Every structure is written in structure tokens, then in C-alpha cells.
Amino acid sequence: MKKKLVLAMAAAMAITSCAVPAFASDDAAGGGKIGISMPTQSLERWNRDGSYLEEQFKAAGYDVELTYSDNETDRQVNDIQNLISDGVDLLVVAAIDGEALNTVMDEAKDAGIPVISYDRLIKSDAVSYYISFDNYTVGTLQGQYVIDTLDLDNAGDKTYNIEFTAGDPADNNAGYFFNGAYDTLKPYLDAGTLNVVSGQTDFDSVATAQWDTQTALERMQNILASYY
């Protein structure tokens, strides 16, 4: 049954429009219990994702335990351990820190519980599936939006100032987002059409711990006060 649960979950998450049929196809297998570990409720997307997954699993006849860990890695480890102790048949985990869950992932593996790494990569061989976007392409689309909005290909002698803000270094996706955007904009930076007045163009300089909006705001306020 666990294998069927994993395959149903992977199919449903990869093809959203087919979510209900994918779950329903295994409903006759007798259901099971799903443990979902989300990073935080402070960002709307995780509320949305957690609620959606819970709704779809319940509609297909599965019991669901949904946890949010308030962006605290130790709390997420504890939440996952509790889900394992509660005897879930499948874990869906959106990691706060993809490198901090190895021990608890091993616990899940030892208990015979498949794990789906949801959106953020968990670097452990205990993970059965990884579901995410093409994150580099997401970054290129962000960069292309800047190009199109400012009409950079027809800028002539016009120049524009730009500053970068990136995501959490602990999130595997953040580097791909940044690299996709930066690589797309680099020709315009090299040509001088775009200028980074602060000089902060490497990922480590522009990253934002835990994707915290207040931290990003304060950094940008400091840049504006110091360089503009």
C-alpha cells in the first residue's frame, strides 16, 4: 500500500489538474495515514499548499496529520518524529533546511515510511521522490520580466539601477532562482544598461535567511540609505 500511496502522491503533485483522479484510483486499497510537514504558516503559500494537500488526501479517504514548524528546524525534526511515532504510511516534507533532516529521515527509512521531499530538496537517500519546479527556469522568467518591463533591448543610452534580493541559503531552490535571474540579466549588467550600485551581486551577499520579509526589507533600506 505504501508504494501505491507514494505513486499516487507523486502523480497528483506533478499534474495538479489530475490530483483527484490520481488519489481516487487508490481509494479502494483501504486508505492510510499521511503525515505532512510544512515549514511555516507565516507565508501564505505554505498555508495554501498544506491545506490543499490535506483536502485532497482526505477527499480520497486518507487520514491526515498536518504540521507547521514556524521556520524552526528543531521543531520540524520533532514534528516529523511525532508523525513517525503516530504510524503514518507516507511523509510529505517541505524542509526548512534541506541538510538538517538527515537523522530524522533515517528514522523514517528505518520505520519503512516513504518520504516525498516537497518543493525543497532534502539531501538524504531516505527520500523516495522529489517534487518541485524547474527552479532555474523560474529565475530566468523573473529576469525576463525585468527585461520586458524595462524594454532593455531598446534602451539605447538609458541606464537603470537594480538591486538583487535572494532567498534562504538553506533552501536548495534559492540558488537556482538567483542564478537563473542573474544569468538572464548578466548581458545587460555587462553592457552597463543595468547597474548594481551597491556592488552586491553574489548570492551570499543578497540571500535572505528563512525567506524572512522583514530581513529583506531592512537590508534593502540599508542599501538605499548607504548607496543612493
Predicted regions: what is each one?
Residues 2-4, 8, 22-228:
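A residue-level marker of the well-folded mature domains of exported/periplasmic proteins
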Residues 9, 13-18:
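Hydrophobic core
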